[in-house]
From Swiss-Prot:
Domain of life: Bacteria
GO CC entries: DNA-directed RNA polymerase complex
Name the record gives this protein: DNA-directed RNA polymerase subunit beta
Entry EC no(s): 2.7.7.6
Catalysis: reaction(s): RNA(n) + a ribonucleoside 5'-triphosphate = RNA(n+1) + diphosphate
Quaternary organization: The RNAP catalytic core consists of 2 alpha, 1 beta, 1 beta' and 1 omega subunit. When a sigma factor is associated with the core the holoenzyme is formed, which can initiate transcription.
Annotated coiled-coil segments of the chain: none
Gene coding for it: rpoB
Gene3D superfamilies, sorted: 2.40.50.100, 2.40.50.150, 3.90.1100.10, DNA-directed RNA polymerase, beta subunit, external 1 domain (2.30.150.10), DNA-directed RNA polymerase, subunit 2, domain 6 (2.40.270.10), RNA polymerase alpha subunit dimerisation domain (3.90.1800.10), RNA polymerase Rpb2, domain 2 (3.90.1110.10)
Native source species: Chromobacterium violaceum (strain ATCC 12472 / DSM 30191 / JCM 1249 / CCUG 213 / NBRC 12614 / NCIMB 9131 / NCTC 9757 / MK)
Length: 1390
């Protein structure tokens, strides 16, 4: 394998036993692909597919006027260029969006003509609002903040059959139901009640007998019965009553009479159960009819109306029960043959028949009126309204759409039903023959056949045949991603537009209107704005570190519009389902009320065209595993036998074991190799990105692994990120895919590097012809993330480095050499230490604080606005009343703080004064005013000050001024500095382009013949370096006339390219200047806005929360001086002391294995460090060969040059880097082998350490006394994180502050500057102690006794330390509450 430029610098030693068949896919593909498909930006207009915006437009257009004489057609849409780029949008607080324009054609028809004749056609582009664009990293900038649209996991449209699990009725009877769920439109439910009657409901309204729906669809009673039942035929003759024999129907029945063969032989005696043998005997005897007792017909249901052939009179109606009276009438009318319904109690229930009997509606019209009354109670049912409503319910494209997915699911569940020998004939006839043509239909509306087939399958379920659906199966739940969600919103906006347009279309001709006059795009842009700005699925991006970004974009939520609600979701929905395997992570989900409702996609999962989740598998042919990969959805997976990724294979890829552990239909089985059809692609296929970053995950309890996965997302980026010694091998993919690192777009040579920019000269073969090949990467410096953490990129390349496409050029936050680095590698000892690690507390060494190991920078944005008030405009100024000289000294003449100023709580950042209301002046004040002019008493100080508890440095200031208001000096200087920087940037780029172009020309023309040129160059002269150097400027090179036509053409191309670049740069500069100098869009009434950015340095301190990657979290309890920390045999103190009791009960043993392997990594690193100083490259190479290739996955160390080996050794000298992939990690023996390589027996250092036999524990010494501890201690290195729960953000104190308006009690929480709640139980405590006065002040003056509060303040000012407690305000609230109930309550003072 070949290593990339950054991989070469530090190769991770992997312990994987199985080579990877499939690389980790691009982790943001779901989001980016979905939105790309929605916009179809790069697709030619005529090749656009019917999805996204195109589908939304096509579903609404054409719009026809009510009178039919005007029509609007949609031709195509185009998206313009966004006016501002991503950074500018973030800075200005606006949305990163592009204008959408649609080409609309208005056709007007001639009213006079009998046929539709086109009178005129008008066409133009109509502005349809702005569509937010996705950034390269899969997020959106909405109003200046970065947001993510989370994918939604919702119930797929289609038909679902289920039962209530016996919970509805007290008897525990299973009540079956079916539900047809469209993508949009009314839901149709069918349900059995405890009496076995079948009902339907529309949109969960009142239930009605299902036969009403069938009659509304045009069925008569006879047709209903003939669809859902097989018939028994009885012959009424003079000699007796005979029944036609259908042997299959008799099986399992109890014979109500003797069944006798033609020869008189008894086949079945009366009251005996008919068995399969009896059936065979009947078939052998070839009985086609048997005589039955005269009363055998009693109680049966008639299948048809029975008519007297002579008189035409109806004797009995269909579905009527045969009684003695009806039998007499039949005999009288000489009816010879009667058909009755074949029903029994076992497997052919009379449910439809019974339901039909409860329904007294006669015809189609009545049935439709009944449905209308149920849907629109209280409205008079006119014929047109009834008809229109019924059509719009399920049969109209406009209001009902199953969608492609819904139709596919519907057809596969109903029309592709698998019959067996127990399936009744009526069902086979109905589904298998009558409706067979419906299998391939793809229409979005329902048809009569669809509804009938659902009822048929539901009755079959009640008859005991078929299976109900599992609604938690991922074949019945699908993912709606950004594109689809945005399309639905866009369509909803267009529907509103359509209503308005239809009204105006009638006037289109008379008023001579154009398409843009007819269409108002406000509803569309409002719908889109509302969705991106405030939908439940549009979330403020979690940007704490790269992992939290990537996880947020890969999240799937069952909540949101059209999904579940937290309160109503049961255990089944939240639970892990067998179909989650490889699709949704079983580990990563939040703790708390959302558990199981918010999930994360597994690493290899993707969505298919229908939105169902798929996971990849390797194909297995005849017990041999191939490298062919198929993606299977949960529905398809059920058909196969799938082996796990850790199944043993031989060298040829054949399965070795006689029985292989496999999965089939959600169950784990043991199968022979020849039965296996697929195999997992990777061991970590089951889990998500966050879970697959946990080394030794297989040794952790699931609950702790969940915490570990969640807490990695809260890790704060450290000042100097450090790679994890023990990783899992996926760190590089996460860092690169998250977009935090800068990745080379094309290969080439690094030309220039500084802290803010990397310039790469592109390889000739990757540069397009005539293009000047230079890539410039501007790095992000000290930028604020959504969570106030610091985003800062640092270059990892040097001038002259050769890099390839996809190589990491610069590291970002929490990345180290292109790998994710969330925490620091700490030397950890598991031992108690004087109670300071009781209950998961963490004891840390002062060294960590001194070395800034866990120091992080947080950037806070503080803003102030100057408004136009009723009393006059607010002013941003330096002249603030009563401002001390020290504070004013930090402000410039515009009243804004200088960059670089170190400020603390209470300091003024931006001076601002607000006009005060006019007050009555005393004559003395009037006199003073007249003498000394206007005084500052007219204004009050409303300056922006540093909030409490904050100390930091001002790193940036931005000033925004409304159009038409003059900028102050500070704003102007910021613009000038920005333009200067930009001009410098462009000049540098131009210089590099020039140099690159001329070096290409040099390579092109040196040694070639010329036809002439400057300095009287003779024809045929071969150009050399000397001649070129002698020309006055390099631009004179273009005047050389080359003999070779091709070279001359290339010269001309380069000249044009350079001129084009110059022009392009001038335009860029002008564009930038225009953007900067134009006024800013500010909210109404705001004249000016100033944003100040403070960088706050947060060092590790007691009270901060820390955690490992195995859910082993704790709070720092004490920072101990280095000299007091326990130390090892060679004198080195440990960094952190953890409580060993935190491991056994939590069952996260992964941390112990990590500690040991980490210790080996550190030992190997120290060993390499010594070798780099003392030994040759050959010896280092030999040692590295041993580390990399004695166990686990081999690496090609031999392929590296000596220089590369030395650089690798240099990078490993702090510690070796290991990868133990999830479920395929290092075994105990391998860890011990690594420990032996790090600390060989007989080595001086090994002796000093005082190891036990397995080198897993050592003797530690107490730093205070120097004595050895009684027992050996487990010491090692663990990657430990500092989490975003910092004590500085939580610590808070209040003396006086705001009160609640109604209760007058102090508010709660730090944000409100609230108090600490003294609750019911705390009151009990004071009561128990008898602390009466303390209790009194808690309940009165410290809480809601308003007069008492002010009195206490007065007393303190006077120096009298006493309280006068009065009536608590909450008591008054209680009195008012009681009075509101009509109870007059008076208070009497005693």
């Amino acid at each position: 394998m070949s290593y990339s430029f950054t991989e070469k610098k530090r190769i991770r030693k992997s312990f994987a036993k199985r080579a990877s068949v499939l690389d980790v896919p691009f982790l943001l593909a779901t989001q980016i692909d979905s939105y790309t498909e929605f916009l179809q930006l790069g697709t030619p207009l005529d090749e656009r597919k019917d999805v996204g915006l195109q589908a939304a437009f096509k579903s609404i257009f054409p719009i026809v006027s009510h009178n039919g004489y005007a029509r609007l057609d949609f031709a195509h849409y185009v998206l313009g260029e966004p006016p501002f780029d991503v950074q500018e949008c973030q800075l200005r607080g606006i949305t990163f969006a592009a204008p959408l324009r649609a080409r609309i054609r208005l056709t007007i028809f001639d009213k006079e003509s009998s046929k539709p004749v086109v009178k005129e056609v008008r066409e133009n582009e109509v502005y349809m609002g702005e569509i937010p664009l996705m950034t390269a990293n899969g997020s959106f900038i909405i109003n200046g903040t970065e947001r993510v649209i989370v994918s939604q996991l919702h119930r797929s449209p289609g038909v679902f059959f289920e039962h209530d699990r016996g919970k509805t009725h007290s008897s525990g009877k299973l009540l079956f139901s079916a539900r047809v769920i469209p993508y949009r439109g009314s839901w149709l439910d069918f349900e059995f009640d405890p009496k076995d009657l079948l009902y339907f409901r529309i949109d969960r309204r009142r239930k009605m007998p299902v036969t009403i729906l069938l009659k509304a669809l045009g069925y008569t009673n006879e047709e209903i019965l003939s669809e859902f039942y097989s018939f028994d035929t009885f012959y009424l003759t003079k000699s007796g009553v005979f029944m036609r024999v259908v042997p299959e129907r008799l099986k399992g029945e109890v014979a109500k009479f003797d069944i006798v063969a033609a020869d008189g032989k008894l086949i079945v005696a009366k009251d005996k159960r008919i068995t399969a043998k009896h059936i065979r005997d009947i078939q052998t005897a070839e009985l086609d009819r048997i005589e039955v007792p005269a009363d055998a017909l009693l109680g049966k249901m008639l299948a048809h109306n029975v008519v007297n052939q002579n008189t035409g009179e109806v004797i009995a109606r269909a579905n009527e029960e045969v009684t003695e009276e009806i039998l007499a009438k039949l005999a009288l009318a000489e009816v010879e043959q009667v058909e009755v319904l074949f029903t029994n109690d076992l497997d052919q229930g009379a449910y439809i028949s019974q339901t039909l009997r409860t329904d007294d509606i006669q015809d189609q019209t009545q049935a439709r009126v009944a449905i209308y009354r149920m849907m629109r109670p209280g409205e008079p049912p006119t014929e047109d309204a009834v008809e229109a409503l019924f059509q719009r319910l399920f049969f109209s494209d406009e209001t009902y759409d199953l969608s492609r997915v819904g139709r596919m699911k519907f057809s596969s569940r109903t029309y592709q039903y698998k019959f067996d020998d127990k399936t009744p004939e009526w069902f086979k006839t109905l589904i298998g023959e009558k409706f067979a043509s419906r299998r391939d239909v793809m229409e979005g509306t329902l048809a009569t056949e669809d509804i009938v087939s659902v009822i048929a399958i539901l009755t079959e379920l009640r008859n005991g045949r078929g299976e109900v659906d599992d609604i938690d199966h991922l074949g019945n739940r699908r993912v709606r991603s950004v594109g689809e969600l945005a399309e639905n919103q866009f369509r909803a906006g267009l529907v509103r537009v359509e209503r308005a347009v239809k009204e105006r279309l009638n006037q289109a001709e008379s008023d001579n209107l154009m398409p843009h006059d007819l269409i108002n795009a406000k509803p569309v842009s409002a719908a889109i704005k509302e969705f991106f700005g405030s939908s439940q699925l549009s979330q403020f991006m979690d940007q704490t570190n790269p992992l939290s970004e990537i996880t947020h974009k890969r999240r799937v939520s069952a909540l949101g519009p059209g999904g579940l609600t937290r309160e109503r979701a049961g255990f089944e929905v939240r639970d892990v389902h067998p179909t989650h395997y490889g699709r949704v992570c079983p580990i990563e989900t939040p703790e708390g009320p959302n558990i199981g409702l918010i999930n994360s996609l597994s690493v290899y999962a993707r969505t298919n065209e229908f939105g169902f989740l798929e996971t990849p598998y390797r194909k297995v042919v005849d017990g041999k595993v191939t490298n062919e990969i198929d993606y299977l959805s949960a529905i398809e997976e059920g058909r196969y036998v799938i082996a796990q990724a850790n199944a043993e294979l031989d060298g040829e890829g054949a399965l070795i074991d006689e029985l292989v552990t496999c999965r089939e239909k959600g169950e784990t089985i043991l199968a022979t190799p020849d039965r296996v059809q697929y195999m997992d692609v990777a061991t970590g296929q089951v889990v998500s990105v966050a879970a697959s970053l946990i080394p030794f995950l297989e040794h952790d309890d699931a609950n702790r692994a969940l915490m570990g996965a969640n807490m990695q997302r809260q890790a704060v980026p450290c000042l100097r990120p450090e790679k994890a010694f023990v990783g899992t091998g996926i760190e590089r993919s996460v860092a690169v895919d998250s977009g935090t690192t800068v990745v080379a777009r094309r290969g080439g040579v690094v030309d220039y590097v500084d802290a803010g920019r990397v310039v790469v000269r592109v390889n000739d073969e990757e540069a397009t012809a005539g293009e000047v090949g230079v890539d410039i990467y501007n790095l992000t410096k000290f930028t604020r993330s959504n969570q106030n953490t610091n985003i800062n990129q640092r270059p990892v390349v040097k001038v002259g480095d050769h890099i390839a496409r996809g190589d990491v050029v610069a590291d970002g936050a929490s990345t180290d050499l292109g790998e994710l680095a969330l925490g620091q590698n700490m030397t950890i000892a598991f031992m108690p230490w004087n109670g300071y690690n009781y209950e998961d507390s963490i004891l840390i060494s002062e060294k960590l604080v001194a070395e800034d190991r866990y120091t992080s920078i947080h950037i806070e944005e503080l803003s102030v606005v100057a408004r136009d008030t009723k009393l006059g405009p607010e002013e941003i100024t330096r002249d603030i009343p009563n401002l001390s000289e020290r504070m004013a000294g930090r402000l410039d003449e515009s009243g804004i703080v200088y960059i670089g100023a170190e400020v603390e709580a209470g300091d003024v950042l931006v001076g601002k004064v607000t006009p005060k209301g006019e007050t009555q002046l005393t004559p003395e004040e009037k006199l003073l005013r007249a003498i000394f002019g206007e005084k500052a008493s007219d204004v009050k100080d409303t300056s922006l000050r540093v909030p409490t508890g904050t100390v930091g440095t001002v790193i940036d200031v931005q000033v925004f001024t409304r159009e038409g208001i003059e900028r102050d000096k500070r704003a102007q200087s910021i613009i000038d500095a920005e333009l200067k920087r930009y001009r410098l940037d462009l000049n540098d780029q131009l210089r590099i382009f020039d140099n690159d172009a001329f070096s290409r020309i040099e390579r092109l023309i040196v040694g070639k013949a010329a036809n002439g040129g400057p300095k009287r160059l003779a024809k045929g002269t071969v150009i050399d370096q000397e001649y070129l150097a002698g020309l006055p400027t390099k631009h004179d090179w273009f005047d050389i006339r080359m003999a070779d036509e091709d070279i001359a053409k290339q010269l001309e191309l380069i000249k044009e390219s350079l001129a084009q670049k110059r022009e392009e740069f001038d335009l860029k500069f002008e564009d930038k200047k225009r953007k900067l100098t134009q006024g800013d869009e500010l909210p109404p009434g705001v004249q000016k806005m100033v944003k100040v950015y403070l960088a706050v340095k947060r060092r590790l301190q007691a009270g901060d929360k820390m955690a490992g990657r195995h859910g082993n979290k704790g709070v720092v309890s004490r920072i101990l001086p280095v000299e007091d920390m326990p130390y090892m045999g060679d004198g080195r103190p440990v960094d952190i002391v953890l409580n060993p009791l935190g491991v056994p009960s939590r069952m996260n043993i992964g941390q112990i294995l990590e500690v040991h392997l980490g210790w080996a990594a550190k030992g190997i690193g120290e060993r390499i460090n010594r070798m780099v100083r003392e030994q040759s490259a050959a010896e280092i190479r030999a040692y590295l060969e041993r580390i990399y290739n004695e166990t686990g996955k081999p690496e090609e160390i031999a392929a590296l040059s000596d220089a590369e080996v030395m650089q690798l050794a240099q990078n490993l000298s702090k510690g070796m880097t290991f990868a133990t992939p999830v479920f395929d990690g290092a075994k105990e023996a391998e860890i011990k082998h690594m420990l032996d390589l790090a600390y060989p027996d007989g080595d001086e250092l090994t002796e000093k350490m005082g190891f036990n036999e397995s080198k897993t524990q050592m003797t530690l010494f107490d730093g205070r006394s120097g004595e050895a501890f009684d027992r050996k201690v487990t010491v090692g290195v663990m990657h430990y994180l500092k989490l975003h729960h910092l004590v500085d953000d939580k610590m808070h104190a209040r003396s006086t502050g705001p009160y609640s308006l109604v209760t007058q009690q102090p508010l709660g929480g730090k944000a409100q500057f609230g108090g600490q709640r003294f609750g019911e139980m705390e009151v009990w405590a004071l009561e128990a102690y008898g602390a009466a006065y303390t209790l009194q002040e808690m309940l009165t003056v410290k809480s809601d006794d308003v007069t008492g509060r002010t009195k206490v303040y007065e007393n303190i000012v006077k120096g009298e330390h006493k309280i006068d407690a009065g009536m608590p305000e909450s008591f008054n609230v209680l009195v008012k509450e009681i009075r509101s109930l009509g109870l007059d309550m008076d208070l009497e003072r005693y």
